[in-house]
């Protein structure tokens, strides 16, 4: 499968094209219409558990989500014929460099082969092409979750069969890196050295050197998160896998969904956990601080990989809204570089 990476000329970048942006998540689809850099309209289309329960797997939701998008555009007086292009969140495509890619039928067909661990982001390119084709306009994806620009030396693990690979929150991390370079450092991303820590239900940490994501700590490596196990000593993990206590499916559930705060405290809600800490729950504090400590270690490791030369450390994702989280991490890592809190997501 080959992808066509799109390089836009500077003149094209300055033109005011009208673009529909689609960001499918597990229980919602965020959409927005931009004209140049101006956002004309945005909304989040939320779906109930009952609405999604009838679908066997995520790719069966295509027609349902397409109809909700078309209705939202009509309800907000957005004429589809006024659009110049459609751009979507990129899903689990083969590993690729960061950038913008033209969606074609081959990419769409590939999404239907990703049954194991299929993610809602896989719907993005499918929806984009379905909506774009009748209009005669192009469809694109940007910075899919499989962006991998890792340096060769960083790929080497202690087992030849298991080279390290980059995966995670590429879209939001790169968007925040670009914003920080532009608005804070006032220089191109290509001239920056940044560490971006994404803090959400899952987390990942990425190192940017000269504009490239050259290394990362994934959400299934050793930093844990509200819904992610992260990692432990491999010997202990292997022993647990073969203990007969858990099935493969249950173990994979700990990796994403039932690990982290969920496993320790029975909830992934950070607001609830912080409330328990305020009320004197010492166990909740130990676990919560342990999670943040694991994130701090990831930042430190990537800083060392960059010879300690870092312009900014960026905290992003929903959990970065927490003053507790920002204060804990900033206190630990500000000796490396100034910390920029850019909470939330910038994925539209």
Regions found by a protein language model. Name each.
Residues 43-81, 107, 111-116:
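N-terminal phosphate-binding loop and adjacent alpha-helix
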Residues 73-120, 138, 146-157:
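Short beta-strand-loop/turn "lid" adjacent to the catalytic site in phosphate-handling enzymes
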């Amino acid at each position: 499968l080959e992808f066509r990476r799109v390089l836009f000329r500077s003149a094209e970048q300055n033109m005011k094209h009208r673009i529909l942006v689609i960001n499918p998540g597990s229980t919602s689809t965020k959409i927005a219409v931009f004209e140049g850099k101006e956002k004309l309209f945005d909304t989040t289309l939320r779906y109930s558990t009952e609405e999604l329960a009838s679908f066997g797997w995520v790719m069966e939701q295509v027609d349902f989500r397409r109809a909700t998008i078309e209705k939202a555009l009509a309800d907000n007086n957005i004429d589809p014929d006024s659009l110049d292009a459609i751009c979507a969140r990129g899903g689990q495509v083969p590993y690729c460099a960061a950038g913008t890619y033209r969606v074609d039928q081959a990419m769409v067909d590939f999404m239907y082969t990703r049954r194991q661990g299929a993610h809602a982001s896989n719907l993005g390119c499918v929806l984009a092409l379905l909506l774009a084709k009748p209009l005669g306009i192009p469809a694109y994806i940007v910075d899919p979750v499989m962006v991998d620009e890792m340096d060769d030396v960083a790929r080497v693990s202690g087992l030849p069969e298991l080279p390290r690979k980059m995966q995670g929150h590429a879209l939001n991390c790169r968007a925040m890196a670009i914003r920080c370079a532009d608005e804070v450092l006032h220089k191109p991303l290509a001239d920056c050295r940044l560490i971006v820590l994404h803090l959400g239900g899952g987390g990942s940490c990425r190192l940017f050197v000269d504009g490239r994501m050259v290394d990362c700590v994934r959400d299934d490596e050793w930093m844990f998160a509200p819904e992610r196990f992260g990692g432990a000593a491999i010997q202990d993990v292997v022993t647990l896998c073969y203990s007969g206590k858990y099935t493969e499916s249950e173990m994979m559930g700990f990796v994403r969904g039932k690990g982290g705060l969920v496993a320790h405290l029975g909830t992934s809600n950070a607001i609830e956990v912080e409330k328990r800490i305020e009320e004197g729950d010492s166990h909740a504090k130990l676990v919560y601080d342990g999670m943040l400590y694991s994130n701090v270690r990831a930042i430190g490791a990537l800083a060392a990989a960059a010879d300690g030369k870092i312009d900014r450390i960026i905290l992003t994702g929903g959990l970065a809204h927490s003053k507790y989280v920002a204060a804990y991490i900033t206190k630990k890592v500000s000796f490396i570089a100034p910390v920029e809190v850019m909470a939330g997501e910038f994925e539209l």
